Amino acid sequence: MIDTTIFQDKTAVYYTLGCKLNFSETSTIGKTLKEAGIRTARKGEKADICVINTCSVTEVADKKCRQAIHRLVKQHPGAYVVVTGCYAQLKPDQVANIEGVDVVLGAEQKGELMNYLGNLEKHPQGEAITTAAKDIRSFSPSCSRGDRTRYFLKVQDGCDYFCSYCTIPFARGRSRNGRIEEIVEQARQAAAEGGKEIVITGVNIGDFGKTTGESFFDLVKALDQVAGIERYRISSIEPNLLTDEIIEYVSRSRAFMPHFHIPLQSGSDDVLKLMRRRYDTALFASKIRKIREIMPNAFIGVDVIVGTRGETEEYFEDAYHFIEGLDVTQLHVFTYSERPGTQALKIEYVESPEEKHRRSQRLLVLSDEKTKAFYTSHIGKEAWVLMEKSKAGTPMHGFTDNYIRVEMDHDDQLDNQLIRVRMGGFNEEGTALKGVLV
């Protein structure tokens, strides 16, 4: 049993890098510490505890993590510093050797962070406590409110896919999940707190159910029945796991929005094989067609990686033309970053940084064209928009069911409200459509 009396009136600062899943987990850690009497430090206040939740998706992410640790150690002298997350799991000794770090916790230990605070006495040398990826078994449920109106609900963790370029299975372990009844209860709690929108998050959420004998489709149907939650968004789902059954259900669902985020990674079948992805372009195209047939106005976001090992100019051109022909809304373009220990390093063909940048820019231009065309097609139409809080005197923003960003004049009473809006032209920045109350 932890003696929490030593934590009374202590303060903590939290810093999160990376994905929405990390933000959800940090929020849960914060709630646990709050229950023990530790409050979040105010802006500019020196904290007693620093919790840093890291990312390691790219080499740049690793660098940002190190910079964040150094910065927080400097800003909060004498604070007890805990580092967790993917970078901590993959390179624990490297993190432990950073001056000022006290404890490094791996994926298995993250959910029990309270147990590693001790009496908050600084360590002369950072201590790394991790579990090998193959032995990571725990699943820590979390549901957090983002900076705006959305809650992020963690339903699954880990991945069994072992794509050639990716370290996530080594950072988060094998695929595992919570039980539907537990997850539904968290959604009910979000509704009780006034939440109206939930984003379903995980590492490979379509793989949900592997550890409980349930299915992602079962989860979707159960969540759709939670009173008070007006909107659900599926954060990202593998194309081979996005079944017609799920697509059809979303099209007639009470609360699941016509909004999909589907990782393509490459539009070249040759590159997909090198990546060890579990689908080809024909399957991906069939999923897009299926969505468009029954939800013509759906927002479809697509992840693409450029410059992977083995991606020749010919393969990239194949990929570009395939993506150009897809009826999708937006591309999330990532430049390939070599990760230690991945199978991709065995592929000999390597592109220059300059060529990677050129390819990235071409796809970003294509993405802008597709997004602008999608927004333009909705000018003059009416839609329900969930508004988000903004600073006084600044425009307010919100999103339609199909994820079009709408800008409105400031009105505090609109915060977290669903309002009927007619969409006009673009705002000055070209990032949203101007809305007028109907």
What role is predicted for each listed range?
Residues I262, D303, I323, L331, ...:
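Hydrophobic, well-ordered secondary-structure elements that form the walls
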Residues T329, T342-K346:
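Short glycine-rich, low-complexity segments
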Residues E311, L326-V328:
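Contiguous mid-protein beta-loop-alpha structural module that forms a pocket-lining wall or clamp
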Residues V81-V82, L90-K91, A192-E314:
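Conserved SAM/AdoMet-binding glycine-rich loop
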Residues K346-V438:
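Terminal RNA-binding accessory module
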Residues G146-T149, C159-D160, F256, S266, ...:
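Short flexible coil/turn linkers enriched for glycine and charged/polar residues
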Residues Y315-Y320:
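Short, acidic/polar
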Residues M1-T201, G206-D207, K221, E245, ...:
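Proteins enriched for Cys/Gly/acidic motifs involved in redox and nucleic-acid/cofactor modification
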